[in-house]
Amino acid sequence: MKKRTIIFLTITTLICVIFGILIIVHNTHTDRRYQSENISNEYFHSDDAVVATVNDNNITNREVSLVKYSYHTKDALDKAIEQKAIVQLANTDGYKLSKTDLEKERDYINNTYEKLNLPDNEKNQMFKEDLIKNHLEMVTSIKYQNQIKMLILHQEFCCDDELINKEYEEYKTLYNEWEAGGKESSKLYKQIWNLREKIAQEYIQKRIEQLQIKKY
């Protein structure tokens, strides 16, 4: 059984490495509209017109242009709405980035901005601050979602949705079964992983649906 688990993990690792290489190659040859130089141009050619709201928190064209850069997506408006919504859920739950994370992410954007070699003026400083704001929202969104997954993993998750709770009970049963078997079943591990991802996604989506979201 251990041999099969080792083989499965080895194959999975190889697939991840290959997939990672493909992503790097893709990003190296990616559409130029997703490069920071071009996003800065798009940002400056965008306006502050409100294109959507999430619980009365506005999303402007300029914010959408930054989200397009952050996620390399054509569906930037929908992604901007999702990001804004998840950040609001994080705020409601009292989730915040650590001081270390804040400093690290700010340094990352400052370094990215410096590479653009833009003149030091008020307009460019506003662009820089918006870059930082959007990036911190993106990181908050990602880390908050990971926190939900960790709560499920450690069986500390709670929810008032009947269907999600049913899936959560199934998850706990599978996890305990996997643990009782010495954590050797790769098949059970895959089921547990997929179910955890599914529960976290459904839980967040259910809460997003309760927010007031409008597109203009």
Regions picked out by a protein language model, each given a short descriptive name:
Residues 61-82, 128-203:
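Well-structured core secondary-structure elements of compact alpha/beta domains
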Residues 32-138:
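N-terminal targeting/tethering segments
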Residues 1-74, 178-216:
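Short, low-structural-confidence N-terminal segments
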Residues 118, 154-162, 209, 213:
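Charged, solvent-exposed alpha-helical segments that act as regulatory interaction surfaces
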